[in-house]
Amino acid sequence: LGEEIAYLKIKSFNVSNIKNDREKLHAWFKENAEKKIIIDITRNGGGTDSYWQELIVAPNINKPLESVSYYLTPFGEGTQEQLKLDGVNEGTLDSDLDKLYNLPGLNWDDLEGISGFGTTMRRVSPAFDKAVCSGPFYLLVGPNAYSSADGFAMFCKNTKFATVVGENTGGDGGGRNVCVVKLPVSGLLLRFRAMHVLNPDGSSNVESGTVPDVV
């Protein structure tokens, strides 16, 4: 790739990798502090947002960065208790769906059965007095970048931490934790998100994923 470019591929943001990867990544960023950084998450199936917030973004920024996303939810009876544990309740939801009508990509069918919408904010503060890398950063994504990997792509696009390059992600980032219910007959446990995350233009993140800056 040349002496001015450094390439890093991260296959997972699994929470169990944070401890082992923290020092490795910090050393790698210091070694390549003056280079253009390419981070490849094209086959990253996700894990936890804490991974990319603490190990990638925080060491390489000089000021706090914030990314806000909308989500829709029916706030159904079967998921209210779990959503409340995650900070979602009647007080945090806005029932005035008319406020979303100015979003050009919104599919009105997505509002059927929805009782309100809320916002999720991802805020990352600098880890050090000075960023380790001077950048710029480029994030490679594709349809296999999913969950928290998509959340990272969404964050990069919204905050300009990195230029997002590639194909649409697999989506499902930017929301809260999943809910778990027990099926009454089989007893099987079902995991799902009781919310529908929107991209900044109102389009469905679940259906479209995050659209790169450069395709």
Predicted regions and their residues:
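C-terminal "post-core" interaction segments
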Residues: L1-V215
